[in-house]
Amino acid sequence: MSIAALVLVAAINNPAIDMDGYLRVAAEAAAYRQSHRLTEDEFLRMSHEPGTIVLDARSSEKFALLHVKGAVNLSFPDISIATLAELLPDKNARILIYCNNNFKNEETAFPGKAARASLNLSTYIALYSYGYHNVYELGPLLDAHATKLPLEGSLLLASDQQQSRSVREP
């Protein structure tokens, strides 16, 4: 690398952004994550256990449309020291996560993302970076219309209302 390039790199240094540190934590989290992926049945069982938090890091708009019943929403861009301390004060609490890429056949609420850009990956690494290591991830790709996981949201309400109208209409 030339002296000019080194000077340029030094000139744009930002101590609040640490790519090397991120990559180290991502590699550590990736190894840890392998033993923290759950089947649909495991996720369902664990979600009902006391002290377990189901976290949905999608946008509040997508969350309102459809989410796992009982989940709390913290949109990924809003994850910070302050928001985590408020929502998840116990870093040892069991946290279950899921994302768009866990559900198919409901693109409005769960639009698919590139596999390498899955929100589960970003969320897992972010939580791990903040010291939350008791995090479990829903593993499989599930049909949103056939999953065992209870879902709730405005899409279901609209669907129920539509079905009620069609049953009453001759």
Mark where each language-model region is:
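A short acidic-Thr-Gly-centered motif at the start of a beta-strand
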Residues: D41-P50
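Rhodanese-like catalytic fold shared by cysteine-dependent sulfurtransferases
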Residues: M1-R37, A64-L74, I79-P170
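Short glycine-rich, polar/acidic loop-and-turn segments at beta strand-coil junctions
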Residues: R58-S59, N101
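Short Gly/charged-rich anion-binding patches and loops
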Residues: E42, R58, S122
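Short hydrophobic beta-strand that contains or immediately precedes a catalytic carboxylate
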Residues: I53-R58, A71-L74
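Short coil/turn segments at beta-strand junctions that form active-site/ligand-binding loops
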Residues: P50-L55, K91-R94
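Short, solvent-exposed loop/turn elements at domain surfaces
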Residues: R45, K62-L65
